[in-house]
């Protein structure tokens, strides 16, 4: 997407169907009409108003840049008959909506990564061996595969934990699966980039030998600002080249947004409480 505004974008954490909290935060921010709005994935699921949330973001048109999160992909997988609804899911209202086909098509055409103004947005994270160029190349491969006529077969093959680490020698299906898992699922990895998918607590809960993906030594995206969500137990975290946005709104905590000024010291945080957007425990 090319810039159509000189205003810095505002990036929102995982909405997960918390429509009222999003509307409250949007009103608090009161962005100018040409301010780009970024969404770090997981627009839907577990919150009480997934359909209204999705329709609202779709209605923003090209102003909205939303990357795919694991819950958005779960919506696609259920719509495609690859997965079934799970306890706590709130995407059934989307699937039953009269405009369901249009909404599913919109989600299916979202990117896995977005790079603009020296900032790279993904849902979950990146592997240490990837620089920004390789991450965008892999995101493009995934995006093109999900936009193709055989997207259902492709999506079915993306689910799975193996292989759990990157190699430039990976063949097509394995290459896409590793990228899929890094972009949408990763929290912890080894210093060498082997992913772990069970632990979902904060950084202190890292299994032995693992660390948060963004603390992997020699991470090749350390020179760009990475914007991401996904990790509610991590919470809002700002470093010079890191913006973590998921502060657990759907769990009754807070919804966060950050105005992404080019100067890290000028970035502005806005939050609202989410007491009325509590999801059932997993």
From Swiss-Prot:
Its EC number is 3.6.1.41. It catalyses: P(1),P(4)-bis(5'-adenosyl) tetraphosphate + H2O = 2 ADP + 2 H(+). It comes from the Bacteria. This is Bis(5'-nucleosyl)-tetraphosphatase, symmetrical. GO terms for molecular function: bis(5'-nucleosyl)-tetraphosphatase (symmetrical) activity. Belongs to the Ap4A hydrolase family. The keyword Ribosomal protein does not apply. Hydrolyzes diadenosine 5',5'''-P1,P4-tetraphosphate to yield ADP. Keywords: Hydrolase.
């Amino acid at each position: 997407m090319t810039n159509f505004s000189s205003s810095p974008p505002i990036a929102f954490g995982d909405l997960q169907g918390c429509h009222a909290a999003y509307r409250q935060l949007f009103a608090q921010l009161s962005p100018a009409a040409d301010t780009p709005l970024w969404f770090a994935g997981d627009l839907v699921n577990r919150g009480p108003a997934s359909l209204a949330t999705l329709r609202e973001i779709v209605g923003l048109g090209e102003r909205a840049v939303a990357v795919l999160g694991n819950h958005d992909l779960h919506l696609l997988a259920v719509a495609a008959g690859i997965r079934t609804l799970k306890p706590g899911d709130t995407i059934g209202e989307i699937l039953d909506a009269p405009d369901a086909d249009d909404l599913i098509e919109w989600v299916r055409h979202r990117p896995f990564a977005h790079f603009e103004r020296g900032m790279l947005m993904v849902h979950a994270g990146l592997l240490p061996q990837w620089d920004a160029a390789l991450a965008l190349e892999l995101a493009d491969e995934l995006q093109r595969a999900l936009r193709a006529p055989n997207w259902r077969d492709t999506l079915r093959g993306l689910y799975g934990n193996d292989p759990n680490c990157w190699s430039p020698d990976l063949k097509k299906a394995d290459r896409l699966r590793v990228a899929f898992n890094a972009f949408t699922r990763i929290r912890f990895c080894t210093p060498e980039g082997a992913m772990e998918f069970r632990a979902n607590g904060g950084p202190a809960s890292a299994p032995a030998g693992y660390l948060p993906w963004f603390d992997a030594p020699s991470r090749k995206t350390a020179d760009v600002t990475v914007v991401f969500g996904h990790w509610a137990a991590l919470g809002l975290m700002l470093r010079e080249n890191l913006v973590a946005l998921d502060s657990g709104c759907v769990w009754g905590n807070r919804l966060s947004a950050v105005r992404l000024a080019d100067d890290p010291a000028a970035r502005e945080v806005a939050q609202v409480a989410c007491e009325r957007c509590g999801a059932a425990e997993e």
